[in-house]
Amino acid sequence: MGEISQEAVERYLEKNPCFAKEYFDKKLRVEALGVIFKNSHAGVQTGLSLPEMTQVEESAVCLELLQCMQDEAGSAEQMAHRALQRLAQLLQADCCSMFSCRARNGIPEVASRLLNVTPTSKFEDNLVAPDREVVFPLDIGIVGWVAHVKKALNVSDVKKNSHFSDFMDKQTGYVTRNLLAVPIVAGKEVLAVVMAVNKISAPEFSKQDEEVFSKYLSFVAVALRLQHTSYLYSVESRRSQILMWSANKVFEELTDVERQFHKALYTIRTYLNCDRYSIGLLDMTKEKEFYDEWPIKLGEVEPYKGPKTPDGREIIFYKIIDYILHGKEEINVIPSPPADHWTLVSGLPTYVAENGFICNMLNAPADEYFTFQKGPVDETGWVIKNVLSLPIVNKKEDIVGVATFYNRKDGKPFDEHDEHITETLTQFLGWSLLNTDTYERVNKLESRKDIAQEMVMNLTKATPDEISSILKFKEKLNVEVIEECEERQLLAILKEDLPDPRTADLYEFCFSDFPITEHELVKCGLRLFLEINVVEKFKVPVEVLTRWMYTVRKGYRPVTYHNWRHGFNVGQTMFTLLMTGRLKKYYTDLEAFAMLAAAFCHDIDHRGTNNLYQMKSTSPLARLHGTSILERHHLEYSKTLLQDESLNIFQNLNKRQFETVIHLFEVAIIATDLALYFKKRTMFQKIVDTCEQMQSEEETIKYVTSDPTKKEVIMAMMMTACDLSAITKPWEVQSQVALLVANEFWEQGDLERTVLQQQPIPMMDRSKKDELPKLQVGFIDFVCTFVYKEFSRFHGEITPMLNGLQNNRVEWKSLAEEYEAKVKVTEEEAGKQEEEASDGKAATDLGGSAEDKKSKTCLML
């Protein structure tokens, strides 16, 4: 058989189409498509037409495109490039291009990514470098329009299309006649626009071309969506890492804004995806000092005419922190940066500080508005390319600084996702300033408190003259300053001048302070400490003890009842319960020392009003302490005195002993809140019941002292018994004290009526003062009787207090009955008068005058 020519084969195939179909169904898939799709550099005969290609099964083409996706899984651009090569061949287009869609500064735009892809072009030649991108908004060109409407567009003659722009043609010298553009969409977001340009074998792209283009671009869409999803995952991962680490570092540093920013920004540097970033911190001064304004007002200095922040501050960057991430990591801090520093010379940070805008700039050195440095900014040779600048705004919406990020690491410009990440960061940093501001305010308040405390202490602390009025060292030792005296000499002098405890009835439950001056009461208080033998045992400096005692006296305000006399009486009763009542056997000397001192301080700085009034008037004390308001204030005042070494009577105790004293102060003073009395009295009653059944004193002591809680419950009830002890005094004393208490209550009632505009309760209503005996009887029955009855059961030595209480109840009951009798007589007389008045009215109605009996409506003639 002779050699068959090519022409003969073509003629045979044309005359036998059925044979040709069978042959190509078997052979073309492997031989022809293998050359077309697998070898990007293989030449394909240009005469191969679409009808000829569509004779091949479409599944084979899909398989080849999937193989391309698998081979180029690492780069969506490379996969898209290979697909565009094949589409250019299939559609018989002169070339294909792909434009990516993004947004900057809130404005969507398209940018060239792959340009002029042909069946034989190389990827490197078609890929557009980030610094050579052609970028234009969506209102320019057909590509922008397709991205805007998100629909494919087949333009047969571009000159007749109103959306066509010849911008690209002028740039490249290319002539566009017709084109087919299709958007690639993920949800509602356009990722890219792919375009086929200039149909070769026809004047325009056909409907069949549109179908093929859209069909096979779905593979490109899958690759781009995968890449976009991966990018979004990276964005969210970076955002969460930035927030987590910045929060971690922000709360590590609360004292200084600069250190707070630096710790946060340095820690998150790896997640910012840029070569370099800088933070400019703004001066927060809103008003100049008066002496800084003098030169301006006198004309010696020109007034500031530069830009200002939205809140009116002069834009002055007092510090720049420059973070270098390219090459060797480095941090530069530039205090008081000059205006020509490369971070400021462009004017962008100033513009952002003035307007509060986010500025995302592509190819920043070419910008005409801002003057960025076009060459290297420093000796590293680093050059500015892309810039993203944002304001740092605090919770008050004041701009406190400007953060500027330079050159995204992948070379691309910063996009909207970078804007969101950095905006999240700057917002968090701005809001975190609330921590440092709060810390600063707290520090200032603490300083003001310390100053106020010092001022108050200066007024209340016993002066040297007041101390010498009790410790007469000048007269006795003939020295001018107390520091020249020895401790034993001062103690001897003090013992000589203090009153005799028996003569002053300090051991008696019936003690009365009325015959004694307030100054002498200070001496009596000092005597009580000497009587319990704690001064020498715990090495209490005599001068310190005297100063503390006198200062406690001055700490009590001159109110009607809760004054120094009441404070002393409570201290004296505590002493009497311990010594005369023999409760001291349950407590150590240190505990007795603390209990006596706490009793003297229990109402220090009382305002003459109760806790309820503090809450009603929303006083600072009520805002500071939620419960037991005044008691907690008395406790804090007492602890404040002990913080001053010259007043700390416990200064020679060890740490553990001092902690014990403070705890006992807390228990004792808070226990004087009567609101807590009803909670503790059941516990106390159980202790008394148990002790009453004990066979010996030793057994009782062991039972009580073995449990610190029992000792605290007893101590708390002792404080209540001391606080209410005026109700147990002899009648001539108790009746006067009751009037003092009542007067203080009435004064509070007057305040409630005038200041708070509220009606006081009967106990504090001055208009119901005649009901005082009845109220006293109720108070004795409801509150007091239990306390002294149980203490009498607990220790028989305390029975005199119960007897005094019962005697006073008889007196108050008698007065209450007298008052009730008077009220009854008054009511009876008022009733009789009403009856007489009503009887007289009835008689008048029945036996009226003749004139009254005449009818006013009918006249008899």
Swiss-Prot record:
Looking at the keywords, is Cell membrane present?
yes
Covalently attached lipid (S-geranylgeranyl cysteine), positions? 858
Q: What are the PDEase domain coordinates in residue numbering?
A: 486-819
> What does this protein's UniProt record list under function?
As cone-specific cGMP phosphodiesterase, it plays an essential role in light detection and cone phototransduction by rapidly decreasing intracellular levels of cGMP.
Instruction: Please state what the protein is called.
Output: Cone cGMP-specific 3',5'-cyclic phosphodiesterase subunit alpha'
Question: What quaternary arrangement does the UniProt entry report?
Answer: Composed of two alpha' subunits that are associated with 3 smaller proteins of 11, 13, and 15 kDa.
Keywords of the record, alphabetical order, are: Cell membrane, cGMP, cGMP-binding, Hydrolase, Lipoprotein, Membrane, Metal-binding, Methylation, Nucleotide-binding, Prenylation, Repeat, Sensory transduction, Vision
User: What's the record's note on cofactor binding?
Assistant: Binds 2 divalent metal cations per subunit. Site 1 may preferentially bind zinc ions, while site 2 has a preference for magnesium and/or manganese ions.
> Which residues are recorded as binding a divalent metal cation 1?
566, 602-603, 723
Query: What is the recorded membrane topology of this protein?
Result: Lipid-anchor
List residues binding 3',5'-cyclic GMP: 97, 116, 169-172, 176
Indicate the segments forming the GAF domain, all copies: 75-224, 256-433
